[in-house]
């Protein structure tokens, strides 16, 4: 019998690994086209995966944005029927024209079941960790 919590964690790990490797295509493949994104680093809601892809491409082109590493801790999965809420603390190293930045943030990714044992993300929310020291 499938373990939905393990499946969600595997889907989250795939997404986090792709982001940490700056693997744009694999990262965005984790999200449905209708996914929404709320980041403390952007002024408004990114109302689709395409909107986040365009913002990613802009950051790469204009600021030399590149993810160097991403680590997930304090992980939690809440299952509500065919939906799962994954929350964690995420430590990210990235670089841009401003130099290397280490971010300490809290993130929630909401998944929905897509097939018998597959989960796809349809919402991501990122906020600074309250006890973070950002450099």
Residues of each region from the PLM?
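Short, cysteine-centered beta-strand-loop-beta hairpins and adjacent loop/turn segments enriched
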Residues: 93-101
């Amino acid at each position: 019998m499938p373990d939905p919590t393990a499946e969600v964690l595997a889907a989250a790990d795939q997404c986090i690994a792709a982001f940490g490797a700056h693997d744009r295509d694999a990262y965005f493949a984790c999200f449905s086209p209708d996914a929404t994104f709320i980041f403390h680093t952007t002024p408004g809601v990114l109302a689709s995966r395409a909107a986040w892809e365009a913002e990613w491409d802009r950051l790469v082109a204009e600021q030399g944005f590149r993810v160097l590493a991403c680590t997930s801790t304090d992980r939690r999965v809440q299952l509500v029927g065919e939906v799962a809420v994954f929350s964690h603390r995420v430590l990210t190293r990235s670089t841009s024209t401003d130099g290397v930045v280490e971010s300490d943030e809290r993130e929630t990714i909401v998944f929905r079941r897509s097939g018998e044992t597959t989960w796809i993300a349809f919402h991501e929310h990122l906020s600074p960790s309250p006890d973070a020291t950002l450099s």
